[in-house]
């Protein structure tokens, strides 16, 4: 994938940044694509760096993700909760599966979506093969993760755990407006606010 470069002029001359490094200077992190350990480690490193720079200033996490590995997503989730700096989340395109959990995990009042984004929640996926005892162990772990994610979504959205369990039994797609009504986000935007707004 080609990554654009941005050239900045200063009194010292020119300096070239890749686009993601330039966004990081503005405290913007972009999560685009599937979530795995490598992606999670990059996102976590950026969160920790920005918190070390200024623990009181908002970090803006833009999300366009179909989800991915639950444990990788939970590592990002836990780091968002761990750091002192508030993390604002903005969905652009889609936030599905773990992407939706991370979207909802933003600072309350600072969870946003652009108007035509799609948000989807569901139960964790798993496929295992091997000895029967190993399959049984993995099945128990998937059920434990499902229970944990349902509790997290109930806490983040204000929905009852029973409703979350029913809705995540199958893929549950929402528009940005529906996600706002559900409690996954706090507002939808078609344009960037003129002043003081996060996105």
UniProtKB/Swiss-Prot annotation:
GO MF terms held by the record: ATP-dependent peptidase activity; ATPase binding; serine-type endopeptidase activity
The subcellular location is: Cytoplasm
Q: What is its main location?
A: cytoplasm
Keyword Aminoacyl-tRNA synthetase set for record? no
Q: Which GO terms describe its biological process?
A: protein quality control for misfolded or incompletely synthesized proteins
E.C. number(s) listed in UniProt: 3.4.21.92
Q: What is this protein called?
A: ATP-dependent Clp protease proteolytic subunit
Q: Could you tell me which species this protein originates from?
A: Pelobacter propionicus (strain DSM 2379 / NBRC 103807 / OttBd1)
Which lineage?
A: Bacteria, Pseudomonadati, Thermodesulfobacteriota, Desulfuromonadia, Desulfuromonadales
